[in-house]
Design a protein with these regions (language model features):
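Conserved HGGG/HGGXW glycine-rich cap/lid loop of the alpha/beta-hydrolase fold
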Residues: 1-44, 53, 82-84, 95
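Alpha/beta-hydrolase active-site loop signature
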Residues: 8, 33-37, 110, 290, ...
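Hydrophobic residues on the short alpha-helix immediately C-terminal to a glycine-rich phosphate/catalytic loop
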Residues: 17, 92, 334-338
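A generic secondary-structure signal
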Residues: 20, 66-70, 338-341
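Conserved residues in the N-terminal Rossmann fold of short-chain dehydrogenase/reductase
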Residues: 30, 286, 315
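Flexible "cap/lid" subdomain of the alpha/beta-hydrolase fold that forms the substrate-access gate
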Residues: 36, 42-80, 87-311
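Catalytic active-site module of serine/aspartate enzymes centered on a nucleophile-bearing elbow/loop
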Residues: 308-342
Length: 342
């Protein structure tokens, strides 16, 4: 079983369920992804000079295949990806269903591979509408906003994440809090479409105030909140591991993923798989109180169309965006139920 973390996390995020998965009889590996934690060998030059070809979606899948081979294995029974790790996991399952025998996507649903311009030779153009400039549309709202993925792609984001006025520990504690079930305003619902007026219904940690940084956004959201609530599932000592690692590495390595994910030119490699479906058994596990479920409108509803062997969704009550940390026992059961049903 291969466990793939998201942003801003580490392999350490799987600490609560790894031993129990191993006790169930599996060889379990969690790894730091390219740009995170203890990884090295990736381009850590300045923002302007970074070789972003290292961070394309297909290269992240390649990293994963290379790792498994290096460990002496020729297949993975199940790849489990959380948040941006679910992007890696879904791509691995999409591209190499022979190698990744099943996939669990957590907290970030697979939206499908999209369509290429079709039948253009005969003037019957389908699937080639220009993409919505969502940043421009969000900025034009009565309350101007911006999408966090595009903010995370900017030249200033890494420094702002690294040196928040409230201090890194308080910032990360607040970020965990507002995206968890402990923030009582997390009552997500499906959005109708990928358009500014709909996306703006999401909280500020996803669709940010236009002129605020992420640390400023979190500080304002935390003004009346009790940050101690999250300590029941994220101790000071555990949070200290993240603080230590991010202080050591900085954030640009992790943020480079957003730079490729938000740049159509950097997504050209994925166009090779346009129209392809995930062909191995697949399931989606997520916190019931997680807005991440709906940040790609329609993705959850379309799972039976984007995955040929979709086995259903599991929403875990009492968990927001960090289910394997907020409700590890329930996540463990959901993963084992899926894997053992194959």
């Amino acid at each position: 079983l291969l466990l793939v973390h998201g942003y801003p996390e580490l392999a350490f995020s799987w600490r609560k369920i790894m031993p129990a998965l191993a006790d169930a009889g599996y060889y379990v590996v969690a790894f730091d992804q390219r740009g995170y934690g203890r990884t090295n060998g990736w381009d850590d030059s300045t923002y302007a000079k970074t070789d972003l070809s290292q961070f394309t979606m297909t290269n992240l899948a390649r990293d994963t295949v290379v790792l498994v081979n290096a460990l002496g294995y020729t297949e993975v029974k199940c790849i489990v990806g959380h948040d941006f790790g679910a992007v890696t996991a879904s791509l691995c399952a999409l591209i190499r269903p022979d190698f990744f025998k099943s996939v669990v996507m957590m907290s970030h649903p697979f939206k499908g591979t999209g369509a290429l311009p079709f039948n253009t030779a005969h003037g019957d153009v389908q699937g080639s509408r220009p993409p919505v400039d969502i940043q421009r549309e969000l900025a034009k709202l009565p309350e101007p906003r911006k999408h966090y993925k595009w903010y995370n792609s900017t030249a200033v984001a890494a420094l702002q994440w690294y040196a928040p006025l409230q201090g890194l520990e308080a910032f990360l504690r607040g970020y965990l809090h507002v995206k968890s079930a402990d923030w009582e305003q997390n009552k997500p619902f499906p959005l109708e479409a990928w358009k500014a007026s709909e996306l703006a219904k999401m909280p500020y940690y996803y669709i940010m105030p236009l002129h605020k940084s992420m640390p400023e956004t979190i500080a304002s959201m935390m003004e009346t909140e009790d940050e101690n609530k999250t300590k029941k599932w994220m101790s000071d000592a555990d949070l200290g591991v993240y603080v230590q690692e991010w202080t050591r590495t900085g954030f640009q390595g992790g943020l480079n993923w957003y730079r490729t994910a938000t740049d159509p030119a950097k997504l050209a490699d994925v166009a090779l798989f346009a129209g392809k479906k995930i062909e191995c058994p697949a399931t989606f596990i997520s916190g019931k109180q997680d807005w991440g479920n709906f940040q790609e409108p329609g993705a959850i509803e379309n799972f039976p169309k984007t995955c040929t062997q979709f086995k259903g969704t599991t929403f875990i009550d009492g968990a927001g965006h960090w289910p394997q940390q907020e409700q590890p026992e329930k996540v463990l059961k959901a993963i084992l139920d899926f894997v053992e049903s194959l």
